[in-house]
Curated annotation (Swiss-Prot):
Keywords: ATP-binding, Coenzyme A biosynthesis, Cytoplasm, Magnesium, Nucleotide-binding, Nucleotidyltransferase, Transferase. The keyword Nucleotide-binding applies. Its main location: cytoplasm. Pfam families: CTP_transf_like (PF01467). The lineage of its organism: Bacteria, Pseudomonadati, Pseudomonadota, Gammaproteobacteria, Thiotrichales. Substrate binds at T10, K42, L74, R88. One of its GO terms (molecular function) is ATP binding. Pathway: Cofactor biosynthesis; coenzyme A biosynthesis; CoA from (R)-pantothenate: step 4/5. Reversibly transfers an adenylyl group from ATP to 4'-phosphopantetheine, yielding dephospho-CoA (dPCoA) and pyrophosphate. This is Phosphopantetheine adenylyltransferase. Its cofactor is Mg(2+). The gene is coaD.
Length: 162
């Protein structure tokens, strides 16, 4: 039986840090389901379908990665896709409090699904989707080193019109 983990997020947009985390999680798990959240209450740069399409493009050559969108409870989506674990990244101590609370709630909802925390590779430790969006607003051309090429192309299309 293969070990499957789910990696949830808004991914608005997916960054090289996210991609690195998936690649590293594949050293632990046989398959990773990247689960793109509907982002309740957040104003997103890209709509759900576009975010899902970009991530599928990023991982198109990796048959060990499946990309899905979801709404509702993460643990229900994890069960639906046969995941035994939730993978989350911790960039800084400030991430821990929120992630610990989420992990505790997910464990209460389904104690069969474990949460695994991975720290980013050092070169990706300061990258976040929020920071990429903030930089892109002022100078989209500066975000190319932080996101996959297909994502940069979408950012360029969005901001070069302005």
């Amino acid at each position: 039986m293969s070990k499957v983990a789910i990696y949830p997020g808004t991914f608005d947009p997916i960054t090289n840090g996210h991609v690195d985390l998936v690649d590293r999680a594949l050293n632990i798990f046989d398959r990773i389901v990247v689960a793109v959240s509907t982002a309740y209450g957040k104003k997103t740069l890209f709509d759900l379908d576009t975010r899902e399409l970009m991530i599928k493009e990023v991982f198109k050559d990796n048959d060990r990665v499946k990309v899905v969108s979801f709404e509702g409870l993460l643990v229900d989506t994890a069960v639906k896709h046969g995941a035994c674990a939730i993978v989350r990244g911790l960039r800084a101590v400030s991430d821990f409090d929120y992630e610990f609370q989420m992990s505790s709630m997910n464990n209460k909802l389904n104690s069969d699904i474990q949460t695994i925390f991975l720290t980013p590779s050092e070169k990706f430790s300061c990258i976040s989707s929020t920071l990429v969006r903030a930089v892109a607003i002022h100078n989209y051309q500066r975000v190319g080193e932080f996101v996959p090429e297909c994502v940069f192309d979408r950012i360029e299309l969005k901001y070069s019109k302005d």
